[in-house]
Amino acid sequence: RMTVYVDIDERSASFFALGLAKASGRPVALVCTSGTALANYYPAVLEAETSRVPLIVLSGDRPPHLQGLGAPQTCDQVKAYSDHVRRFIQMPLAEGAPRAVAFARQAARELVLSALPGGSDTCEGAVVASRACSRMAGPVHANFPFDEPLKPDFSVSGVFSAGRSALDGADGLAGSAGLAGPELAAESRLSAATCDQVKGLIRGRCALVLAGEGTCESLEEAREMAAWAKAYDLPLLADPLSGLRSLSDDGVIDNYDNVFGHDDFPVPEVVIRFGRYPVSKRCVQKLAAKRPIEIVVDAGETRDFNAMTDLFVACSPIDFARSLLACAGDARASEEFFSAWCEANAAEHSRILSVEEDSRERVTGKAANGAEVVGDAEPESAAVAPRPEGAYVREILKATPAGSCLFSANSMAIRAIDTFYVKGDKPLAVLCNRGLNGIDGTVSTALGVAQHFEQTTFLTGDFTLQHDLGGLALQREIAQVAAERGKPAPSIVVVLLNNNGGGIFEMLPQASDEPYFARLFSAPQD
């Protein structure tokens, strides 16, 4: 059964669809008319491309004989998204000929296969978002020209069955039950030669794992990944979007951003990076300065803007770990280096808790025991800034139910989560639009993500909320669709960090250029 949402704002609709696909891992279709309508989808298409989210854009168009002649709502829509989509198909004029219907069905298959090139199944029980988004999924576009009369005639016999495969719904055909969608590709395994090469690089060396967005897609995978890393004495530096901070294992390093804030941080000789670089800019810069050997594990591309890739392994992180475990031969990294990272992480954990308390005192004027606080206390560590967001984020995380979703805006919101989301709190799905790191359509994306969870908490700053305030109008449509399905609408709690823009631009060199900075960069809201 297909669920249909109607939204009058194409930009908001596109990010809502992005959120639906991001959370479920299934392709979501975006339908629009011609003209500026599909142009409003462009930002979401760019985010889907860089975040590897399966999005199918179906645009209506005017017929060929009206193109280039000034006809209303008519522009050149052929390859409108250029190379930002995985596949573009220009459809013929709609007609009922069997060959045209067969082409349309084949085009639908091609679009789905291109949106999910890893072969993810589209039927019930399909793989979840992080798997789909780790196998080079992405947006696709089909453009449909229509001529008048535009009203379809649904009374035509066989309009929905024409051109179907003989295996669709056939009874008694061997294996037909499993042909509802593309078959799921088998897991990839490393060759023995690659396993030996990787093991040779990490054996006895100071090595660590940098786990980026979408490293693990379930709690079971996270446990498996942590066990593998510990068996190899590899500190597992866990980005907040990696799926690993639900664990409390000693080898899971959640405070690595603050560890890198000290000059004496444990310097690696080898880094194994899973997927995208982490949120922490300090981590990326410090590692680039030290230039260790870097092994990049990713299903499709290096995503290496620092040009540090020494060895690229094309597979998913979990298949990488399983392959190494299956290969014979010991390859433990330096045990002393592993212990050094665990100790440094534990020390930063206690400092973060003290900064959290300092933030709470600044916000409430009271200590945890209720005592009044006079004056500002100095932070214990220069690596951690005592911003008020810390106390808020910790309280939000404590109140967020286990198994629910925490969707974060970019800018200061995701950085606050990176600092104050302490490992082992509870299993959460933490998501964010990190493809282009922008604030566009964030409210709408959060609402789309929320349709996949019973409870979603959305953390955002004031700039981001204002930028997509119109997305809140979707709530009426969401409630109506839920009522039609006889189900309650999913719950979403919006937490606003009303922090006058968050101050992230104050970190730029231009911050010292007054009066231009306040007018052109910080754009204060007060």
Residue ranges: model-predicted function:
Residues 1, 17-21, 410-429:
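Acidic-glycine-rich active-site phosphate/pyrophosphate-binding loop
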Residues 4-15, 30-37, 407-410, 430-443, ...:
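Active-site nucleophile and cofactor-binding loops and adjacent substrate-binding regions
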Residues 171-177, 288-414:
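Phosphate/pyrophosphate-binding active-site segments
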Residues 59-109, 118-123, 127, 239-349, ...:
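Glycine-rich, acidic loop regions that bind phosphate or pyrophosphate groups
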Residues 58, 65-82, 89, 421-526:
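Thiamine diphosphate
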Residues 3-4, 23-62, 267-275, 454-467, ...:
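A short, small-residue-rich loop immediately preceding and capping a beta-strand
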Residues 40, 211-295, 425-455, 466-473:
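Glycine-rich, anion-gripping cofactor-binding loops and their flanking helix/strand elements
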Residues 110, 114-204:
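Conformationally flexible catalytic loops at phosphate/diphosphate-handling active centers
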